[in-house]
Amino acid sequence: MRVEVVRAPGPLNRPALAEAIDTLGKKSATVRPSSATHRATAQTLSHEITSTDLFATSTATEQQQTLLLAINDDDGAVMGFLKTGVKHLFYLNPRGEYTEIDPICVLDFYVDEVWQRRGVGLQLFQRLLQEENTTPAQLAYDRPSPKLFAFLKKHVGLTEYFPQPNRFVVFDAYFQSRE
């Protein structure tokens, strides 16, 4: 497996790659029952938030969006993606005070079901940390799914956060790492 990094409004002019990204973006937002557990396996979104059209917008450029793609070495198939961008957030602390922050945010993270639980997501996440020269605690997470919470707990030990009205999760360790 290799990881390709594309920065907005980067070149997604390879038709097969663009089609694969659009397909995975739709899968990422769709709720399907898992045959093994009979529970929802995606993010319960009303529409996809990752597509080649959205990646080509001025908003994607303004947010410095990056798309990390896990590519199968054997057949070139896109196995998963991780989309990030910088967002200006108002963080509400437990005392009711707001702080303005501009973290790199995990905006969408999806590995195709056939490739899940094989280390693909972990490799994407580690490559993100390497590319951005950051730590998991220094990131914000846009509406993380239960699967992403479990992933972060298992692989990097992030669990403590104060719920935000904007549904972004900024872990308490974000502020501890800046002290």
UniProtKB/Swiss-Prot annotation:
GO terms of biological process kind: regulation of microtubule cytoskeleton organization
InterPro entries linked to this entry: Acyl_CoA_acyltransferase, Atat, GNAT_ATAT
Pfam families documented for this protein: Acetyltransf_16 (PF05301)
Highest taxon above the source species: Eukaryota
Residues holding acetyl-CoA: 109-122, 145-154
EC code(s) of this entry: 2.3.1.108
Record-linked Gene3D superfamilies: 3.40.630.30
Catalytic activity of the protein: L-lysyl-[alpha-tubulin] + acetyl-CoA = N(6)-acetyl-L-lysyl-[alpha-tubulin] + CoA + H(+)
Single GO molecular function: tubulin N-acetyltransferase activity
Domain N-acetyltransferase: start-end pairs: 1-175
Alphabetical list of PROSITE patterns matching this protein: GNAT_ATAT (PS51730)
Record keywords: Acyltransferase, Transferase
GO cellular component, one term: microtubule
Function (record text): Specifically acetylates 'Lys-40' in alpha-tubulin on the lumenal side of microtubules. Promotes microtubule destabilization and accelerates microtubule dynamics; this activity may be independent of acetylation activity. Acetylates alpha-tubulin with a slow enzymatic rate, due to a catalytic site that is not optimized for acetyl transfer. Enters the microtubule through each end and diffuses quickly throughout the lumen of microtubules.
Similarity remark: Belongs to the acetyltransferase ATAT1 family.
Name this protein carries in UniProt: Alpha-tubulin N-acetyltransferase
Species of the source: Phytophthora infestans (strain T30-4) (Potato late blight agent)
